[in-house]
Amino acid sequence: MRWSRCYIPTLKEAPSDAEVVSHKLLVRAGMIRKLTSGIYTFMPMGLRALNKVAAIVREEMNRAGAQEVLMPMVQPADLWQETGRWEFYGKELLRFRDRNDRDYCLGPTHEEVITDLVRGEVRSYRQLPINLYQIQTKFRDEIRPRFGLMRGREFVMKDAYSFDRDQAGCDESYKAMYTAYQRIFSRLGLRFRAVEADSGSIGGSFSHEFMVLADTGEDTLAVCTACEYAANVERAEVTGTPCTRPAAAALAEVPTPGAHTIEEVSAFLGVSADMLVKTLLFVADGEPVAALVRGDRELNEVKLKNLLGADSLELATPEQVEAWTGAPVGFAGPVGLHGVKRVFADTELEGDAGWIVGANKADTHLREVSLTRDAAIEAYADLRMITASDPCPRCGGAVELPKGIEVGHVFKLGLKYSKSMNATFLDENGKEQVMVMGCYGIGVSRVVASCIEQNNDGDGIVFPPPIAPYEVALLLLDPKNEEAAAKAAEIESFLEAEGHDVLLDDRDERPGVKFKDADLIGSPYQLVLGGKGLARGVVEAKNRRSGEKTELPVEGFAEAFRDWRAGVLKGWGL
């Protein structure tokens, strides 16, 4: 393809609302344009990258035995009401009514639709297992869409759904999809890690996230340096360590005027934060609950929500805190907490040790509080966020906390949807059984952005070869030089015959502009044809990733290019 015929509107400056590198570079490279908040148009170059990701996803899904379908984006409310998610999904579900006053939504996911489809078709165990997938546009009405394609409201997603006779079959389907995902992200040239994860609003018993490793990632991972354990910090287990502090003495009330935070109380009383207990108040499915962690720890709200089995968990408002405790925020404690009947504590707090807690009284705390003696704890559980100082829960090794971007998620759904929607089949004995489900998602458009977050430099995008809109940027420095133009056309024809996508820059622009644009759009292989080089019988080749330059002979170019390209691919691990 000739650049002069392409629509590639590159920009020198990024838009002011672009916060992350991928957003800035996707706009500057002319790959996306914003329509409205969280909604983007894919320009020709961006769509080429998106389609290349989708093609690899499609190949590996087909290879794993899944079959492609295409389901409607508009979904009727009655299906969501069957599973109960119409009420609990939240405001991310965009609801609307048609002219006949019937309720619908724009699909953020398709569990209900696919289950309705399969329950109407499958009657016998002989028809199972089934794995159906689609690559389709989704919509989630994010409250704060940001970071371009990383957290938009409209996005392209691959979602697959498996239906099996029993849990053993579901486990096999899960393994097949897990393996397919490893192949997909390896083929894309991404550095990634599969980690144990929380199932969130999708539900189910077990799940893994596939994370692209990037310092700009929104997710934090807990990765053991000694074994294979890896988990999202929301899921990461913390091994309980026995409290060795002395048993509590007599409970005592102490004034703490104006000390609302852990830091302020610690400073006022002259003690370290690990001698205090935080009492955090929440509303779980409309019911007040309290959660306790050590003062220097962070509560893991996902663990608390899972412990409660709650559909919703929200931090109590200042007004609710005062109504339940009789004190303003900052003085809540587990002793005499009459407005909250359910109190949970982290395992680290179990025992007779003396702690400092809020007194449920303004400007007052209690010392020497034993949770065993002085408070009514419903249960002790792992409720805290893992830190780098905590040991691996599997082997006791050291834990690192790298950042990652979620690009894929696989779930064992079990009977969550099939049971509520009565998706059944007749087994070998003619007995009715409920299908066991799994679901498997990949954020196709997010993969493009994540790739750029992981692969960029000061000059622009550094695309891995499988994702690049054009693998080869062929720079013709002087289009008016007939000999150079003829040689460029010859090289272009050879490369295309070899199966490479080639962008021949034949624009009437200064060489400096061409070099800058080639770096910006991120083609992994750059070839430069200039009059001086051709006079010496060479074509300059640049590895976009390493920046290394070499000269390839015009005579024998084919073999020289193949050898050079093999070296570039090796650097990518491809």
Curated annotation (Swiss-Prot):
Q: Which domain of life is it from?
A: Bacteria
Do you know which CDD domains this protein is assigned to?
ProRS-INS (cd04334), ProRS_anticodon_short (cd00861), ProRS_core_prok (cd00779)
EC code: 6.1.1.15
Q: Which Pfam families match?
A: HGTP_anticodon, tRNA-synt_2b, tRNA_edit
What keywords sit in the KW lines?
Aminoacyl-tRNA synthetase, ATP-binding, Cytoplasm, Ligase, Nucleotide-binding, Protein biosynthesis
Q: What class of enzyme is it?
A: ligase
Q: Where does this protein reside within or beyond the cell?
A: Cytoplasm
Xref: PROSITE patterns = AA_TRNA_LIGASE_II
For domains, the record's comment is: Consists of three domains: the N-terminal catalytic domain, the editing domain and the C-terminal anticodon-binding domain.
Q: What is this protein called?
A: Proline--tRNA ligase
